[in-house]
């Protein structure tokens, strides 16, 4: 079965094509992405209207490239990110996917963007066993129990304020590094000393929810430090901030795995591309005797391949097609894999 999927939840226009084998394996055939990030940089963040217009302009060419790369003229299924995400951006991708589904007369599946991030990993590491999922991106930070990609996902905890990626962008802006800030801040932090400045670790007290996150206090602490220490090394500030984020994320994820008796940790989402998060997670998983799975950086950011993978796993588990009047849902919860 050939599955073509459209991703348009934010500022990347993605079209992915995957094949679902009779044995349940999912093989990537094409992964084409067009990003409008450069158009948003001067505004310091994603502008929804610009993102929607960029999707309209990029979707056709991206679709043609994906079909050519895969050597496919007509898929057996069309899927699309139905949510969460920016309302206008979602609408463009969903409308296009429905149109292709109707024109090709093939089933349509409306699936969850966040589940897609988890499903991207199978292209690098094969079938996913029962796992603790740490999903970290610009808009989301969730700790999840994933029994399989075809079963309902259980949310253990999430951020009570800022997402991890949002905190990265805000600190990068504070340091004058521009937008998007994640990659630039990561590079700067490698030049600094993570022990030079110790920033607070939110939601780590004995009475705090062990699976919840908070990055607002950390963001404020960094801002106050920079204001009161103008002579401080930017690299040290970046390294101290990054260490605080990676410390909390990995400590809570490993704790959840131990609490639930799960031996695999999957880290997914855009922040999963961060070098210190990957390094510290590797160290802590090795110490705990756990298996760590993180997709290659290309598959951590938004793309259509991950949506094709998640749709394939839902189909393999018996999911029925979505109706063509299924509406996009900007606030779709992570526990709802599909809009049926």
From Swiss-Prot:
UniProt entry tagged with the keyword Transferase: yes
PROSITE patterns tied to this protein: GLYCOPROTEASE (PS01016)
GO molecular function: iron ion binding; N(6)-L-threonylcarbamoyladenine synthase activity
Reactions catalysed according to its record: L-threonylcarbamoyladenylate + adenosine(37) in tRNA = N(6)-L-threonylcarbamoyladenosine(37) in tRNA + AMP + H(+)
Pfam families linked: TsaD (PF00814)
Top EC class for this record: transferase
One of the GO BP terms on file: tRNA threonylcarbamoyladenosine modification
Binding site for substrate: 135-139, 169, 182, 186, 274
Residue numbers binding Fe cation: 113, 117, 302
Subcellular location: Cytoplasm
Cofactor(s) the protein needs: Fe(2+)
Cofactor remark: Binds 1 Fe(2+) ion per subunit.
InterPro entries linked to this entry: ATPase_NBD, Gcp-like_dom, KAE1/TsaD, Peptidase_M22_CS, TsaD
Gene Ontology cellular-component annotations: cytoplasm
Main location class: cytoplasm
EC id: 2.3.1.234
CDD domains: ASKHA_NBD_TsaD_bac (cd24133)
Keywords attached to this entry: Acyltransferase, Cytoplasm, Iron, Metal-binding, Transferase, tRNA processing
Keyword Ligase included in the entry's annotation: no
Record NCBIfam families: gcp_kae1, T6A_TsaD_YgjD
Cited function: Required for the formation of a threonylcarbamoyl group on adenosine at position 37 (t(6)A37) in tRNAs that read codons beginning with adenine. Is involved in the transfer of the threonylcarbamoyl moiety of threonylcarbamoyl-AMP (TC-AMP) to the N6 group of A37, together with TsaE and TsaB. TsaD likely plays a direct catalytic role in this reaction.
UniProt record similarity statement: Belongs to the KAE1 / TsaD family.
Protein name: tRNA N6-adenosine threonylcarbamoyltransferase
Organism in which the protein naturally occurs: Mycolicibacterium vanbaalenii (strain DSM 7251 / JCM 13017 / BCRC 16820 / KCTC 9966 / NRRL B-24157 / PYR-1)
Gene coding for it: tsaD
């Amino acid at each position: 079965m050939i599955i073509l999927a459209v991703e348009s939840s934010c500022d990347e226009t993605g079209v992915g094509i995957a094949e679902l084998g009779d044995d349940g394996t999912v093989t990537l055939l094409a992964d084409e992405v067009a990003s409008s990030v450069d158009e948003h940089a001067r505004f310091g963040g994603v502008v929804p209207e610009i993102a929607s217009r960029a999707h309209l302009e990029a979707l056709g060419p991206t679709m043609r490239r994906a079909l050519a790369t895969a050597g496919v003229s007509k898929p057996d299924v069309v899927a699309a990110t139905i949510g969460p995400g920016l309302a206008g951006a979602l609408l463009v991708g969903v409308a296009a996917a429905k149109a292709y589904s109707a024109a090709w007369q093939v089933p349509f599946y409306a699936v969850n963007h966040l589940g897609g991030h988890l499903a991207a990993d199978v292209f690098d590491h094969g079938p996913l066993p029962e796992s603790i999922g740490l999903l970290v991106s610009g808009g989301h930070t969730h700790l999840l129990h994933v029994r399989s990609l075809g079963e309902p996902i259980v949310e253990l905890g999430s951020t009570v304020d800022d997402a991890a990626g949002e905190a990265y962008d805000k600190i990068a802006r504070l340091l004058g590094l521009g937008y998007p800030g994640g990659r630039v801040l990561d590079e700067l932090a490698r030049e600094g000393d993570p022990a030079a400045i110790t920033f607070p670790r939110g939601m780590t007290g004995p009475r705090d929810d062990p699976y919840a996150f908070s990055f607002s206090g950390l963001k404020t602490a960094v801002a106050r430090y920079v204001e009161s220490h103008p002579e401080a090394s930017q690299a040290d500030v970046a390294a101290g901030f990054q260490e605080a984020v990676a410390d909390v994320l990995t400590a809570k994820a490993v704790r959840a795995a131990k609490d639930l008796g799960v031996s695999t940790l999957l880290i997914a989402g855009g922040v999963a591309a961060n070098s210190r998060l990957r390094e510290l997670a590797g160290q802590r998983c090795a110490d705990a005797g756990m298996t760590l799975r993180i997709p290659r950086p290309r598959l951590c950011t938004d793309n259509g391949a991950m949506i094709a993978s998640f749709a394939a796993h839902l189909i393999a588990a018996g999911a029925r097609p979505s109706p063509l009047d299924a509406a996009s849902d900007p606030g779709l919860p992570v526990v709802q894999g599909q809009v049926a």
